[in-house]
Amino acid sequence: MNRQAVKGTQIIAIVAALAGWLVPGLGHLVLRRWSKAAVYFLCIGGLACAGLAMRGGVFGAGAEDLFNRLGFFADLGAGVFYFLAHQIQTAGPDVAHATGDYGTRLFAAAGMLNFLTVLEAYDIGRGGEAK
């Protein structure tokens, strides 16, 4: 493969990874993996929405301790769901019930799962998986 083709492949892989982070499944959609894109969007979106429906907390950027920083990193992985949740969450987490804690964990799990799909989209974009 010549240099130009390698550079084009790297650009496609980076664009797919960034798109996949911003909107779960969009990176696979860019790579024309229709079914994977739909499954990833529905699963990650479902986890994020379930976490918010349970009044789970969303970690902010101004974290003071390591746990909150890791929570912010995990939540940030959810892409557009994080930014929407950060804007619409006005009441705060439900700390009086266990469901609020479960919701916080579900939202963080959605973000971490999206990071895995971003890595997969990048790998596919680089030619790491048979088409």
Where do the model's predicted regions map?
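Transmembrane helix recognition focused on a "late"/terminal membrane span
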Residues: M1-A17, Y40-K131
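Membrane interfacial helix-start motif at the N-side
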Residues: A5-T9, A19-K36
